[in-house]
Amino acid sequence: MATSKLQALWNHPAGPKTIHFWAPTFKWGISIANIADFQKPPENISYLQQIAVTCTGMIWCRCSTIITPKNWNLFSVNVAMAATGIYQLTRKIKYDYVSEAEAAVEIEG
């Protein structure tokens, strides 16, 4: 039974013999790096980089559900990219705008 499942995976149109398997698998490295950057101070986060990560994730989530064969590895990695990009952008925006607003209130008060 396990052999037949492994053989089915091996021979799948998006299986390990194709770029449709390896491209999203290596793309997980970007999401993992973005998760590792959660510890990075918000002032070091790049708006352009995180916008690119977020947009790429959103665009390819949609495309991964349309293409044949359905590639759930591609879909899941792009959900992770969009989610981590949105989180990093939220951290940066809070740091740049909420922190400045709080500092201005403290100076006025």
Swiss-Prot record:
Recorded topology in the membrane: Multi-pass membrane protein
Annotated localization: Mitochondrion inner membrane
Major subcellular location class: mitochondrion
UniProt keyword list: Membrane, Mitochondrion, Mitochondrion inner membrane, Transmembrane, Transmembrane helix, Transport
Transmembrane segments: 19-35, 51-67, 74-90
InterPro entries: MPC
One of the record's GO cellular component terms: mitochondrial inner membrane
GO BP terms: mitochondrial pyruvate transmembrane transport
Record function comment: Mediates the uptake of pyruvate into mitochondria.
Name assigned to this protein: Mitochondrial pyruvate carrier 2
Organism: Arabidopsis thaliana (Mouse-ear cress)
